[in-house]
Amino acid sequence: MKNFGQQIKTDELKGINHHNWSLCQAQSNTQKAKILFGRIPGGKLTRKLGWKILATGIIAQAVLLVSPAFANSTQKNLSYSQLLDKIQAGEVTEIDYYPSRGIAKVSLKGQRSREGMYIVQMFEHVPELLDQVRAQKIDFELKRSPDNSVAMGIIFNILIVFVVIVVLLAILRRSSQSQGNALNFGKSRARFQMEAKTGVLFEDVAGIEEAKEELQEVVSFLKKPEKFTAIGAKIPKGVLLVGPPGTGKTLLAKAIAGEAGVPFFSISGSEFVEMFVGVGASRVRDLFKKAKENAPCIIFIDEIDAVGRQRGAGIGGGNDEREQTLNQLLTEMDGFEGNSGIIIIAATNRPDVLDVALLRPGRFDRQVTVDLPAYKGRLGILEVHARNKKLTPEISLEAIARKTPGFSGADLANMLNEAAILTARRRKEGITPNEIDDAIDRVTIGLSLTPLLDGKKKRLIAYHELGHALLMTLLKNSDLLNKVTIIPRSGGVGGFAQPIMDEGMIDSGMYTRGWLIDRITISLGGRAAEEEIFGLAEVTVGAANDIRSVASLAREMVTRYGMSDLGPLALENPNGEVFLGRGWQSQQPEYSEEVAIKIDHQIRTMVFHCYEKARKIIRENRVLMDRLVDLLIEKETIEGDEFRRIVSEYTELPKKQKSLINLEKKI
């Protein structure tokens, strides 16, 4: 019954042994490529600098090749015959001959500078030119310039070879990386920290004192083992954290990592299994090999149910790889070889699907339940998360803790964060009770939307929600009403009647039959109000969620809690889902068809009785309902104390409700 109503890559270590020659050769080539581009610390160049050098070389080559051609395209040219004609005409004043380049630069009369000299392509033997130069008494000078053609050719060839080598090394590096990835499939993906700095200590964990004490003992054993070994105690090999989502299992693991001061490996259960056969088992072996090298240490496996589920037929036959991984995990945890100094901490919210061999002492010696926090736990969690929040003096963490039974630690943290966001949005200096109430509504029900404008629809929703609220106020075993509103919420919620849950009952899980029956009656109050006020033809689908929860609760009362005329019999397994590793046989009903008919009859009888009771109460208080509807349409929200005062004017309240009104009057 306790579960009713609850919603329940630091890099890998370096070093690979036993590689074949080809792999070593590939790695050597890859290393050269990495050194070239600065990927390893041993390289003299950084990667960016390597690429800059390559780009500079290519640009320089282009400049050297293009600049002469560009320069030549801007100069004035003369043919050899034109040069002879101009010499004969007496227009040439000076000739500079460059035999290594096979050209001559010619100055004509009227030129002011040597920059405008004409270029003439010369032949090897020019005797007639020399004769005419002597005859015309032209200045002729033989220029000796270095021959750069050979050097240019060498540079050009070197650059081409360099580019080809760079491209080949890049291709080789990529291929070797892909080959290395394939070979690294069997390596563990666990994140390793020599001294984990998670930023979380045990003082940051609140609300789960019993679980924290168990794990603090493990940390003490790692820090001071002689304290325990002196009296013959052995350190637990494994600790399994069990509890609903959001209760702080992973937070506890972070606190252990921050407090232990020993090497810490963390991995998710889903990271063991891949599509390739044998990869999971190989990763388990590699993980424990690294752990042994760093013992004493801690291995944290989050969501271990992903790899540790019950072995068996299950659905289909595609779970051999997972079973092989689990077998290897069982062997490493408590097999032929010991793992002294290695503590395994795992977390799951589905312990019922874990293999029994995984849960036995010697593997997981301790199972620590991290349950939803009670009042004191919620208060401690609120104090931790309120440290960095600006709260106004009227905020009472004790009152908030009493308003939030059934909240997990994650829910409380999210609620305070939503309150802080609302405060900033409303431009207030501190969080007030209004922001807290709105944040609780947002977390539990949904985002507040624009109020309805349609009069008929608004009135129908008002009657529906007041049907819940009126029954909540008049039934003697029900919870107290906190407020009723017709402001719509996200997710299709047109309004709601919010109860103040009995924290003692919620925290203990000890739900009474009277409370459960009244809960069914209250859930049917909305549909009953629609039918009584508007008639059967105007009944809407707004009660769909209510009817679904009623059917589920009534079936649990008959088949699990033994609260029907069938007697105290548990007729159904509480876990109705079929999991891998759980065969269909375990899901077959454990009763005959005749008993199944009786179960259906008991459920129908219980629900119909509650429905008729709800209709009767609404029918007898029709005048009160009409007044409350007008008030609710006007104000859109009625607080619980005001609602009880109005109801008390028309009818007598149950003892619990009446005592609350008397208390409010005294205040």
UniProtKB/Swiss-Prot annotation:
InterPro entries noted in UniProt: AAA+_ATPase, AAA_lid_3, ATPase_AAA_core, ATPase_AAA_CS, FtsH, P-loop_NTPase, Pept_M41_FtsH_extracell, Peptidase_M41
Keywords: ATP-binding, Hydrolase, Membrane, Metal-binding, Metalloprotease, Nucleotide-binding, Protease, Thylakoid, Transmembrane, Transmembrane helix, Zinc
Binding of ATP, residues: 243-250
GO terms for biological process, alphabetical: protein catabolic process; proteolysis
Entry binding sites for Zn(2+): 464, 468, 546
Broad EC category: hydrolase
EC number: 3.4.24.-
SUPFAM superfamilies linked: FtsH protease domain-like, P-loop containing nucleoside triphosphate hydrolases
Gene Ontology molecular function terms on file: ATP binding; ATP hydrolysis activity; ATP-dependent peptidase activity; metalloendopeptidase activity; zinc ion binding
Identification of the protein by name: ATP-dependent zinc metalloprotease FtsH
UniProt source species: Trichodesmium erythraeum (strain IMS101)
Gene (UniProt): ftsH
